[in-house]
Amino acid sequence: GGPQVPPPAADTIVDASGCLVTPGLINAHQHLYQNLTRSMAPDFGGSLTNWFWTYFSMWQHLDEEAVRTSTRVGLMELALSGCTTSADHLYIHRAPGWIDAQVHEARDIGLRFTAVRGSMTLDESDGGVCPAGMAEPHAYVMDESERLVRQWHQTEPNAMTQIALGPSTLMSSTLAVYRDTAALAADLGVRLHTHVADDPDEERFVRERY
């Protein structure tokens, strides 16, 4: 080794002998609500479409308590694994206030958190994979997205809470909502977040539809 330099003065000294010290880990993409069904392993034949339909039948019963609980459990597990920054893409909104609940949980735990206000606007009646009744109106998505950014998004260095905008997928969101979300994100100065070409099902869907 090199020259031994005495450590600077500190209020607290942690003996990390025998430990691996790393920077805080970053989780760039997750769906925390899916913690509620992670023990289930149905056979969906390797098809994303079948996967959607299998799990949407359960996720359509989500409520704020389920979102709050899954967020708390998921973020606590991440913190225990060494993660200090996480993004979560929540695109199911059966009622208003779910992103707000996530922000409160993240602040309580102390993780740096980017809440992605996801959306689904293309349901099965229009050829999408989103079950009828789970799609949101286009205008409502835009209004809620702007509200969340203005209420929660922090812009200062080392901000602990940020909002990003993210239609879920072209299989469950219209081109119009993609375009308008991108324009709104640019106007508000926030990030975009989505899924692209997850599997051959999505590629076929996009080629056939667009």
Model segments located where?
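Histidine-centered catalytic micro-motifs
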Residues: 23-35, 191-200
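Metal-coordinating catalytic core of metallo-dependent amide/deamination hydrolases
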Residues: 97-210
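Short, ordered loop/turn segments at secondary-structure junctions
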Residues: 3, 37, 91, 118-119, ...
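Histidine-rich, glycine-flanked metal-binding segment
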Residues: 1-22, 165
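Alpha-helical scaffold segments that flank or form the walls of functional sites
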Residues: 38-112, 142-158
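N-terminal capping/lid subdomain adjacent to the active-site entrance of alpha/beta enzymes
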Residues: 21-25, 30-32, 58, 79, ...
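Proline-centered helix-kink/hinge sites
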Residues: 23, 60-64, 167
